[in-house]
Amino acid sequence: MLGRAACKVLHRHALKNPYRFRGCLVAQKETTRQLATHVQHHLPASADDRLLVDLFDQPGASTSKSSFASTGLFGHPTLTHPGALISLAEATLVRAQLLTERILRARESRDELVKVVKNLDRLSDMLCGVIDLAELVRNAHPERLWMEAANHAYETLCEFMNVLNTHVGLYEVLKVVLSDPSIVKTLSPEAYQTALIFWRDFEKSAIDLPPAERQKFVSLSSDILSLGRQFLENANTPRPPTSIKASHLAGLKDQGMGVRLQLQARFTKKDLQVYPGSLQAQMIMRSAPEEEPRRRIYIASNSSTPEQISVLEALLRKRAELAQLIGRPSFAHLTLDDKMAKTPENVSNFLDALMDHTRPFARRALHTLAQRKQAHHNLPSLPVVQAWDRDFYCPPDPPAPPIPLPPLTLGTVFMGLSRLFRHLYGVSLRPAKSASGETWHADVQKLEVVDENQGIIGWIYADLFARRNKASGAAHYTVRCSRRADDDDEAGDLTLEGEGHRIQESQAFESVKRHRLPNQDGVYQLPLVVLLTEFARPSISRGPTVLEWYEVLTLFHEMGHAMHSMLGRTEYQNVSGTRCATDFVELPSILMEHFLNSPTVLSLFDADSTTTLRATGNNHADPCHSIDTYSQILLAAVDQRYHSPSALDPSFDSTAELANLHNTRGLMPYVPETSFQTQFGHLFGYGATYYSYLFDRAIASRVWSKVFAENPLDRSRGERLRGEVLMHGGARDPWHMVSALMKMPELESGDAEAMREVGKWRIEDEVGISGRH
């Protein structure tokens, strides 16, 4: 419960779980798409928009750094050296312990009972505010001492969170609050939702079990973490090479690589040893006319040792045991309780509907691959398409924009994003000066998020260029959540003799975060997020960073998360911004990718244009996209099967389950001697929720087509999204939000029929990239 995504030590690319005290085919088919022919007017680029271009394209020449003022990380004056972070963690721990004691004493006063939900949220925020900062520092700071200090702070406070997760006293106090109708009546809908989230998370921690069973829960949880760590290490362990005869590489499409490999074989007079995942392996899979080398590489790439399989099956078994310990039939039942899906049966309904929709398209694509294979081998009848044929007969195409575009620099894309947000929400991005010591690297740029009515509503720190010792991939870090702070009643907090300076240190850290917004009651802690990517650095010789289209998609995706954090300003941090259900959190970010399908939106990348003449354009469909989508649906089904009650069956065999699913519901036959499941890392981070990305893709596709496609820059539609979805964070039932946004009251119940309906919605996005979070 109190164990935040900040405590997601094991798999940072997994979907962030919303913990409460948490961290914190024949020739390629061409389709013609009609693009209306009317002129659409849009707002001109502002001076601030244009400054974004210089900020990111000429960072050395920008004036984003202040040469006079100095401070500490994120503007906290004391965080100027690594030891200060350790000191802050210790001060936070003292103050958190005192706040915990205040909550435990709440039964002595009805007035204190009324404040319990607020104080639980304060406690969560107090800890997460440091844990989340430490998580960012240990993933992004270039200096070893800072990373070590961040690890120490992170582990110290996570250890205390783990105590709170199973704290019987806190649970009993919350139970008193929720059992008293007169107190419940005083809670706002948002406060009540926050209380229910705390309650459910306590119950998932076996809080109401006898001591011996609670101890077993702790032991099982520890085993799961340990096995999860081993599983992820195994998933990332390189697979052994396979032996390829040089004679099997004759006729390679990539002639340069083919010649080099054959020369290597002649020189060594040995078969080639090709490592799965290497450039050579990828080239062979895409360009070797002979089937045998592709088959061998496929099998090698999907191989496992018995020990690797054993670790996964032990993890699945321990999860099932933990679920049954607290009265749930399976880990899937336990996990899905507070998700949009609610039950494994509803997930099955969704996946079945999605399979039924996608299967005809996938089979049509597979038939085309079979025709290509037949022609290639001059066969009298259509052959079976095997898994190792996919890339050879249908090489994956990189994502491409729907219309021809000039090279897009990083600054140009940020300018386009700012212009898009101003059209949709009346919000823009503005370069801001950062004081000396405020950022952890010279590359980091600070942006103010500015609302036309309320002024600054949050900050984004953009750390976008690759460097050594920086976390890989793209990620959105919520370093500070939104919440209301003027009703904290700090005066009622307990004190401890001799600890006054530590209490003041923690209070000073929190005071920096607070702001009073125009036209809004109260004082708020404003959100602060960090975007991490690893784009190429601009230079004098190469010029500004030019993004590939997939990188533009990535940036739009992550900025979807960032704007959810900015606009999801709630009174309780536990439900702010992206603090929402796992199977809902990707909706805003995937929807952002859809905007890149619109030439009207793409015209915002031109600073001097205020109109777009939209004419008929051609869109080249990837004929194998449906095969890939179907494969992802199958993986979601595997995830559900692995987390069903069958995981406790003594005869459970993860490889047999995988083979059975492939042979009964897959497109291509299962390949003997393969066991891909040991490399399916999301089985840990996404356990029982891998369907979520598909689910949000389906909803985002329908939201785009029904709400935005006709007029993507329309302010009223943007305000509709903001008012019905983004501003609520996780404070409202996601089904209610989707139902209101789509004007489909039949979805509001979120029942099996609603899940089935979403499964029927065609996933029209050709922009999604699996695994981006």
UniProtKB/Swiss-Prot annotation:
Protein's name according to its UniProt entry: Mitochondrial intermediate peptidase
UniProt keyword list: Hydrolase, Metal-binding, Metalloprotease, Mitochondrion, Protease, Transit peptide, Zinc
Source organism of this protein record: Coprinellus disseminatus
Gene3D superfamilies in UniProt: 1.10.1370.40, Neurolysin, domain 3 (1.10.1370.10)
Location relative to the cell: Mitochondrion matrix
Details of cofactor binding: Binds 1 zinc ion.
Any one GO BP annotation for this protein: peptide metabolic process
Organelle transit peptide residues: 1-35
InterPro entries (UniProt xref): M3A_MIP (IPR033851), Neurolysin/TOP_dom2 (IPR024077), Pept_M3A_M3B (IPR045090), Pept_M3A_M3B_dom (IPR001567)
PROSITE patterns (alphabetical): ZINC_PROTEASE
Reaction catalyzed: Release of an N-terminal octapeptide as second stage of processing of some proteins imported into the mitochondrion
PANTHER family noted in UniProt: MITOCHONDRIAL INTERMEDIATE PEPTIDASE, PROTEASE M3 THIMET OLIGOPEPTIDASE-RELATED
Gene: OCT1
The keyword Acyltransferase belongs to this UniProt entry's keyword annotation: no
SUPFAM superfamilies: Metalloproteases ('zincins'), catalytic domain (SSF55486)
